[in-house]
């Protein structure tokens, strides 16, 4: 677990302000757009999870809405719990194949039987 510096609030406000100037106000995962009135719901995520790694070009930052940010961090919690690995920005669900069951496959035939 990373040690949180005493001046964390000041550091956070500094990189947040920079990130909001560098990037469009859009969640990097769900593409939700933000305006000034709901900007508090847009967070800065550190891609490498090191809150002290704040390069001026923003290469370690990603703007995420509250929900996507929570989801991103929950993946790491689950990985710790179950001993799996996580690749930043990727979901395990992407590896799952397409669904093969089609509930409407014979719908026309079923409807014709009732007539």
From Swiss-Prot:
The keyword Hydrolase applies. Pfam families: HNH. It is an enzyme of class 3 (hydrolase). InterPro entries: HNH, HNH_nuc. Residues 27-75 form the HNH domain. Keywords: Hydrolase, Nuclease. GO terms for cellular component: cytosol. SMART domains: HNHc. Its EC number is 3.1.-.-. GO terms for molecular function: endonuclease activity; nucleic acid binding; zinc ion binding. Belongs to the HNH nuclease family. PANTHER family: HNH NUCLEASE YAJD-RELATED. This is Putative HNH nuclease YajD.
């Amino acid at each position: 677990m990373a040690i949180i510096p005493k001046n964390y609030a000041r550091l956070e406000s500094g990189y947040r302000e920079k990130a909001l100037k560098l990037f469009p106000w859009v969640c990097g995962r769900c593409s939700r757009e933000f305006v000034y009135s709901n900007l508090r719901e847009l967070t800065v995520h550190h891609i490498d999870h090191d809150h002290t790694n704040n390069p001026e070009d923003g290469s370690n930052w990603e703007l995420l809405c509250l929900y996507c940010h929570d989801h991103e961090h929950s993946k790491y919690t689950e990985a710790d719990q179950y001993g799996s690995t996580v690749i930043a920005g990727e979901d395990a669900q992407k590896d799952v194949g397409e669904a093969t069951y089609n509930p409407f496959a014979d719908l026309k035939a079923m409807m014709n039987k009732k007539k």
